[in-house]
Amino acid sequence: ALANAQPAALTLAPAPDTINYQLINTEAQLAELLTRLDAATAIGLDTETTSLDAMQAQLVGISMAFAPGDAVYIPLGHTLTAAPEQLDLDDVLGYLKPYLESDKLYKIGQNLKYDEHVLFNYGIKLNGISGDAMLASYIIESHLGHGLDELAERHLGLPTVSYESLCGKGAKQISFAAVAIEDATRYASEDADFALRIEAHLKQYMDTKQLEMYQQLELPVAEILFIMERNGVLIDKQELA
């Protein structure tokens, strides 16, 4: 049913006039970021980690986008070789926790359920999830791929910095924690920026029924799945016997 409801063609999202991806690795820069968060109503959000298994993943960094082309990256778990200067993870999370847990600051991302698990590993319950580019893509174009690389090509007309180009593949693949901080900043900032742009773009093409399905079914179900994955489910053994 979703595929039948897709629009005939989607135009590319407009490109921002400038691109500003900023590294946050000093206390002064962090203070400026907190001031920006105080004034923000919505952000693009992404986490960089050590594993695709969200339950086991450790934070390497957090990126946030405030507007198209405007994003920051906070390295938290890079190796000293990759990032000689970075802020203390516990200190940063302590400052960010009220914003991440606030339901008044809306968060948009790409498969945010993963990031929700990662942050929960550190005692942070991500609230205010209002958009997910992956789920928006499923509503509009269920027959196509929903990965961020594909979405960026399709809707922004842009190639992304691929994970493999930074970390390699196979036996020689390195951890994201070992990626040079300049490269990591661009990669992570792109993730938050592109997710923010793509989600807003796709939402413009949703009709009333699709928007209702997106906001009242897909996003709430993702939260239910998070709870189920986190806590497990009870099984009636007698009923199954």
Question: PLM features: residue spans?
Answer:
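Long, highly charged low-complexity segments
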Residues: 1-62, 76-99
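Active-site-proximal helix-loop-helix substrate-binding element of RNase H-like nuclease domains
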Residues: 19, 60-207, 217, 221-225, ...
